[in-house]
Amino acid sequence: MNGAQWVVHALRAQGVNTVFGYPGGAIMPVYDALYDGGVEHLLCRHEQGAAMAAIGYARATGKTGVCIATSGPGATNLITGLADALLDSIPVVAITGQVSAPFIGTDAFQEVDVLGLSLACTKHSFLVQSLEELPRIMAEAFDVACSGRPGPVLVDIPKDIQLASGDLEPWFTTVENEVTFPHAEVEQARQMLAKAQKPMLYVGGGVGMAQAVPALREFLAATKMPATCTLKGLGAVEADYPYYLGMLGMHGTKAANFAVQECDLLIAVGARFDDRVTGKLNTFAPHASVIHMDIDPAEMNKLRQAHVALQGDLNALLPALQQPLNQ
């Protein structure tokens, strides 16, 4: 089995049955291997379209989207899609061909440092430097894309490694993503909720990404709390929920925006306080204490200082915050 065949084998092992791409010289061995079957390839007219299609596939299926491109202009055309996937927390694995290893750094035909270009718009980027590390890198790419806050990962594979043959062993890896449960902070948040007179729930796209919609709806059923959603959070709160105020922000409803400005406790769940929602940060929810719940520690206190920051799985945090109300 050569490297290109192993790439397709690794895709099948990850449960991938559809990829999006545009062929070119440096990735041609992988395209040859795709003829072996088991993975459907959908030809796009541009590599950016392939990246966007992979994003749409991931959104619609909950699986990791995969896009494929050649070296040079093929790889650079993926960048906009990778940046979109990073900002929207979409799991995508981008596989790019690269010039053969001896030619890297020589300004060879269609050689671009895609590893360097992609660092700012991916969770992680890999350059495969030997056939033997290909199984590990393919396994880690999918783990990194899906773990914690999801996002895009790029795997750059030189053409000579795609063509090299050898006996490769399967690699099984799982990224450790265990987060210590914030017991003290949860207790503090419970006390704030118990004292609040006008609490408000601010729901972002992280709820859906965490598959925490059922937990959120149970929390709302127990608290009868007014709720508003961001654009990406739409659908997390049922439209017929009696205390649902619609979308928040620049393009949101008057009711949602007025309510946030008057609340005394704002619970942000999987939301990031972006400018389309807040406008001027120093005038957003001016009377509110803030509880911020998110899987990504980088979002905590990034834009709005939280009185209590709860980092962790929303499926654990929401029931924990709700527990005293049940009792």
From Swiss-Prot:
GO MF term set: magnesium ion binding; thiamine pyrophosphate binding
In this chain, FAD is annotated as bound at: 149, 251-272, 294-313
Q: Which InterPro entries match?
A: DHS-like_NAD/FAD-binding_dom, THDP-binding, Thiamin_PyroP_enz_cen_dom, Thiamin_PyroP_enz_TPP-bd_dom, TPP_enz
* Keyword Transmembrane set for record: no
Pathway it works in: Amino-acid biosynthesis; L-isoleucine biosynthesis; L-isoleucine from 2-oxobutanoate: step 1/4; Amino-acid biosynthesis; L-valine biosynthesis; L-valine from pyruvate: step 1/4
Keyword flag Iron: no
Which keywords belong to this entry?
A: Amino-acid biosynthesis, Branched-chain amino acid biosynthesis, FAD, Flavoprotein
Q: According to the record, how does the cofactor bind? A: Binds 1 FAD per subunit.
Protein origin, superkingdom? Bacteria
What is the required cofactor set for this protein?
Answer: FAD
Q: Name one Pfam family in it.
A: TPP_enzyme_M
Set out the biological process GO terms recorded for this chain's protein: isoleucine biosynthetic process; L-valine biosynthetic process
Q: What does this protein do?
A: N-terminal pseudogene fragment of this gene. If the reading frame is restored, catalyzes the first step in the biosynthesis of branched-chain amino acids.
Q: What else is known?
A: E.coli contains genes for 3 AHAS isozymes: ilvBN, ilvGM and ilvIH. In strain K12 only the Val-inhibitable ilvBN and ilvIH are expressed; ilvGM has a frameshift that disturbs the ilvG reading frame. The ilv02096 mutation causes another frameshift which restores the open reading frame, permitting the expression of this isozyme and can be seen in entry (AC P0DP90). Restored IlvG is Val-resistant and is expressed in K12 strains having what used to be referred to as ilv0 mutations.
Quaternary state and partners of this protein? Tetramer of two large (IlvG) and two small (IlvM) chains.
The entry sums up its family as follows:
Belongs to the TPP enzyme family.
Annotated protein name in UniProt: Putative acetolactate synthase isozyme 2 large subunit
Organism name = Escherichia coli (strain K12)
The gene is ilvG
